Amino acid sequence: MKKKVLAIALVTVFTGMGVAQAADVTAQAVATWSATAKKDTTSKLVVTPLGSLAFQYAEGIKGFNSQKGLFDVAIEGDSTATAFKLTSRLITNTLTQLDTSGSTLNVGVDYNGAAVEKTGDTVMIDTANGVLGGNLSPLANGYNASNRTTAQDGFTFTIISGTTNGTTAVTDYSTLPEGIWSGDVSVQFDATWTS
């Protein structure tokens, strides 16, 4: 009888042990978008970005991807105007890492092969000198109409420089700290109607 009880106890112990189960592994991330809404159909010049920028580091090229940033331009015509000029100038372009490292990235902006810089204006349209704006040409044709004219075009955005701590420049982006950088890239547009 003792042997039977012992055998049943052993079977129960081995059955209770079972095979080790692998635990499920899950991960979760949250993406957050800043959101605002604005409508302006009365200003002489309205420029609206059509999307946002998201740069991703690519290990294979040890760099960040470039982005095409589209924008919409609307102008109010001036029937007394004989010429029209539209220029752009870079205002802000620094992204800062969201930790305590102080690491920064600078974003370069290019319009049809010309750098948009903080130190001077980039001419996009200048009807007096035959610069008709490529994709923005509807503005060059409608600046002296009695209604509003719109056109769309885009900038090319690239990461042009970075620092590990806000001061120490990097030449190899693979040496940047891991993390997320955030900030604004702002471009000022100036329109001039000449009468």
From Swiss-Prot:
Residues 1-22 form the signal peptide. Keywords: Fimbrium, Signal. Disulfide bonds: none annotated. GO terms for cellular component: pilus. The keyword DNA-binding does not apply. InterPro entries: EcpA, Fimbrillin_EcpA_sf. It is found in: Fimbrium. It comes from the Bacteria. Induction: Negatively regulated by H-NS. Positively regulated by IHF and EcpR. Belongs to the EcpA/MatB fimbrillin family. Self-associates. Forms filaments. Interacts with EcpD. Part of the ecpRABCDE operon, which encodes the E.coli common pilus (ECP). ECP is found in both commensal and pathogenic strains and plays a dual role in early-stage biofilm development and host cell recognition. Major subunit of the fimbria. This is Common pilus major fimbrillin subunit EcpA. The gene is ecpA.
